[in-house]
């Protein structure tokens, strides 16, 4: 293709946790089930994530994992610079990283409610949560984990281990 793009992915099981919390806090959510129901739902669940991911995977895009970005933002920054053939001053990069952190954005959201652009969410809903990795471990039971493994095998998703 005649474009360059970055595909930023996060562990799909952590995505399910975040998406579930978002849906449960919408005042007009059409989803009313449990977390286990959510990950199995055709519209919201793991299969939908896999289909979306696979629709981008084979395009000429740079793949960046959220987890790698959190663990070594400097390395990922250099990869992005090289991919787009751009140079950004280190101090500007450092400031961008600081101002993109979940903690920084969460503070802004609390202080100014600027990120509260969703009209149909509960009043105290906070869109930016912790941004922590492996939150799914406290949400997925053994049956959910087996379901996820089966879905990953079905769609040949090998970027993350379960």
Feature locations, PLM:
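Generic recognition of stable, solvent-exposed alpha-helical segments in well-folded globular domains
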Residues: 7, 51, 71-79, 143, ...
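PAPS-dependent sulfotransferases, especially Golgi type II membrane carbohydrate sulfotransferases
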Residues: 20-23, 27, 36-43, 53-57, ...
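A contiguous catalytic/ligand-binding core that recognizes phosphate-bearing ligands
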Residues: 6-7, 16, 29-38
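Rossmann-fold NAD(P)H-dependent dehydrogenase/reductase core
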Residues: 16, 49-53
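Phosphate-binding beta-loop-alpha motif at adenosine-nucleotide cofactor sites
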Residues: 58-84, 107, 135-139
């Amino acid at each position: 293709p005649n474009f360059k793009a970055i595909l930023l992915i996060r562990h799909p099981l952590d995505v399910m946790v975040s998406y579930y919390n978002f849906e449960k806090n919408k005042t007009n959510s059409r989803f009313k089930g449990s977390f286990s129901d959510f990950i199995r739902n055709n519209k919201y669940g793991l299969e939908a994530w896999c289909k979306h991911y696979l629709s981008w995977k084979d395009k000429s895009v740079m793949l960046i994992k959220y987890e790698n970005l959190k663990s070594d933002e400097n390395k990922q920054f250099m990869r992005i610079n090289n991919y787009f053939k751009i140079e950004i001053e280190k101090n500007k990069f450092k400031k961008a990283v600081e101002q993109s952190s979940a903690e920084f954005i969460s503070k802004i959201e609390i202080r100014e409610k600027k990120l509260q652009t969703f009209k149909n969410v509960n009043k105290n809903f906070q869109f930016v949560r912790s941004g922590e990795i492996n939150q799914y471990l406290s949400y997925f039971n053994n049956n959910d984990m087996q379901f996820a493994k089966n879905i990953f095998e079905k769609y040949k998703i090998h970027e993350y281990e379960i």
